[in-house]
């Protein structure tokens, strides 16, 4: 679950601009695609259950609300202007900003901690038990040893090194 050097540099550059918009930077995907690259930014909002409700200028309660279109527009404008000034991406690129959604991708091991007991889809770099793709129940996240523990098909438990995870997503369930 490590970002490439280019993605990490972009993440470090973008994070302050995103947070200045009052939202959290959940993660980024930088996908070089020939002449036109794609920079996808995922934003989220941390909900403090103990916080007093906030009433915005329209008289709406903001506590516990997710990411809205207005948040994406604000971040797009802020980050877009910053990227225009610093120009860290050579050539043309498309900038997308969205919430992580129901099937949220995970970019850092710490992000998985809030989803213990839920189903995740994993794509590994190197095969484990002759497989690179798993749908499994997340049992534990070990930050010290940088690994996760999952239950595959309700049958057996696997410990997976986080450095072997190419991609991880939540599997949405009703």
Swiss-Prot record:
Record GO biological process: ribosomal small subunit assembly; translation
UniProt keyword annotation of Cytoplasm present: yes
Location relative to the cell: Cytoplasm
Annotated disulfide bonds: none
Keywords assigned by UniProt, alphabetized: Cytoplasm, Ribosome biogenesis
One term under GO cellular component: cytosol
UniProt xrefs under Pfam families: DUF150_C, RimP_N
Superkingdom classification of source: Bacteria
Predominant localisation class: cytoplasm
HAMAP family, sorted: RimP
PANTHER family according to UniProt: RIBOSOME MATURATION FACTOR RIMP (PTHR33867:SF1)
Family, similarity comment: Belongs to the RimP family.
Biological role stated in the UniProt entry: Required for maturation of 30S ribosomal subunits.
Protein name: Ribosome maturation factor RimP
Organism: Acinetobacter baumannii (strain SDF)
